[in-house]
């Protein structure tokens, strides 16, 4: 019983750490999950390609929850591989959870029978169980699972808005890593007033302004430099720290994003030029 699926990375419009309301959008690079189920096996094991020491508790929990709910509690093995750097603010955990849940449903033969948003909720529950998220990250999960841009209330796992956005994007990932579960939530809560304003902007469809206000606020709250965002502003529709960092994402038209990428390439780390993604997670 084998299944395989991919799910995209995502960037941030609104970080949910301040109020529980968040917004994110899918980016066109993926993580892939391959799941092999064994009916006679009770446990689940996992590995992450090129990261032998990485914690696989999240993806193992995804398999277990999916087989408990939609199968007969089968055990097995899950392997993830892909282009999304770990602990970089690009929603690698949400993408891995989405891909793993879909791959497990594929292995069970029910991938087309389960609504995508319910599959995303299953991955969010696994993330909470595994302790890799503060807010549940339903915004990140829905953006990656459904594609496009989503605005969510993570306190209720409620999808408020889904919209399709057609942007070019530049992604700068510095060499350091930051784990969202380690973020200083109390400092983030101090920018709740700005976060409410960002949510209003996003709900009104002013995504670029929302993203930029979020970026400046959460750079301050999480102690990241604003210089990369300020450098990008003349060329971008919107720019923000992504998640809890350290990556920054700028969106806009092709020429503007090429200018941003050129500027960001002067910094250490890696710069990727990509686009938004509208189809979300899918079996392969």
Pin down the residues of each PLM region.
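Short beta-strand-to-loop capping motifs
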Residues: 37, 174, 250-254
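Short glycine/serine- and small hydrophobic-enriched flexible loop segments
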Residues: 64, 101-109, 200, 216
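Alpha/beta catalytic cores of group-transfer enzymes, especially the acyltransferase/condensing modules
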Residues: 117-159
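ATP-binding N-lobe of GHMP and related small-molecule kinases
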Residues: 1-85, 277-284
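Acyltransferase
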Residues: 163-225, 233
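Glycine-rich, charge-dense phosphate/pyrophosphate-binding loop(s)
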Residues: 204-284
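DPxDG-like acidic metal-binding loop motif
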Residues: 90-118, 145-147
